[in-house]
């Protein structure tokens, strides 16, 4: 995944430098693009959920900055605001899953969580409105909601 992200980022930077060659704000644009790449690399190389979360939030922030690059254009402002609102929906899923994850595992480290997942799966389920939901399934559901929000899927796109 690391090689893929670096390769695609290289191609995007190369294309952007040619496309934006005459723009007086190319330095700002390439800074935003590099920031996006940095946070994406942080996201995919994370060793724990805290680092993953910081990368996740950074990707959202840098996406907003890139979408709103030409901030004097009304449509760019509207699109950026819409993107940040949709991202907030996804972030709710991540926030909530991390809260439950720490409650169940007492750790954010991937290794600890992956070693304990079978034990937590066997624990008593969480009862919500008389429905018994397994703790791991509950966490995975909200992580999935976070991914849906970040990629603007299932009713969050227009």
Question: Where are the predicted features?
Answer:
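...captures the hydrophobic TM-helix bundle architecture rather than a specific catalytic motif
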Residues: 1-158
